[in-house]
From Swiss-Prot:
It comes from the Bacteria. This is Urease accessory protein UreG. The gene is ureG. One of its GO terms (cellular component) is cytoplasm. Belongs to the SIMIBI class G3E GTPase family. UreG subfamily. GTP binds at residues 22-29. NCBIfam families: ureG. Homodimer. UreD, UreF and UreG form a complex that acts as a GTP-hydrolysis-dependent molecular chaperone, activating the urease apoprotein by helping to assemble the nickel containing metallocenter of UreC. The UreE protein probably delivers the nickel. Keywords: Chaperone, Cytoplasm, GTP-binding, Nickel insertion, Nucleotide-binding. Facilitates the functional incorporation of the urease nickel metallocenter. This process requires GTP hydrolysis, probably effectuated by UreG. It is found in: Cytoplasm. Signal peptide: none annotated. It holds the Pfam family cobW. The lineage of its organism: Bacteria, Pseudomonadati, Pseudomonadota, Betaproteobacteria, Burkholderiales.
Amino acid sequence: MNAPHTMHRTKKLPPLRVGVGGPVGSGKTTLLEMLCKAMRDKYDLVAITNDIYTKEDQRLLTVAGALPAERIMGVETGGCPHTAIREDASINLEAVDRMLTRFPDADIVFIESGGDNLAATFSPELSDLTIYVIDVAGGEKIPRKGGPGITKSDLLVINKTDLAPMVGANLDVMASDAARMRGARPFAMCNLKALEGLDEVISFIERKGLLVG
């Protein structure tokens, strides 16, 4: 039986579900804010945020004006954040269904996970594309530590490149390690606060998500 949002959808292609994961403080919410502001005039967007005990990221996106408040939904996961996006994604799958019932013609559903470790990944039932965000302040060694977030995500974002001189990180080393760990999978060096690298992320979403020819 078709879900309500499927029956009322007028667009031919299904909505693209983009999962955004990464450790606490890496810049996931900043990335989501910048993506929404840059893409909302071209695409029909909705966003779902995950926090363990609050809906702080939903509030931050709303206050920042990333999207109208009704297009942003906060999910309180409780417990381990990765469980709600991988082992038992039912709470997020339900949130996606609710948002698509309200906005059946959404082009993209962004799903931000709660802050987690390098082993966190999205269930393929929940996300079509995964973006994993790490930051330079976490240390030059982060890319070579591996883990599914580093090696298996569709796009790795290395954020806060502007902080490299302050923390003694060599960006060339980080880029080399990322390329070695990821093989053919792409990565982007970004300073999202200054919008540096954002166009590269948007281009990836459009190209890999088949939003453009």
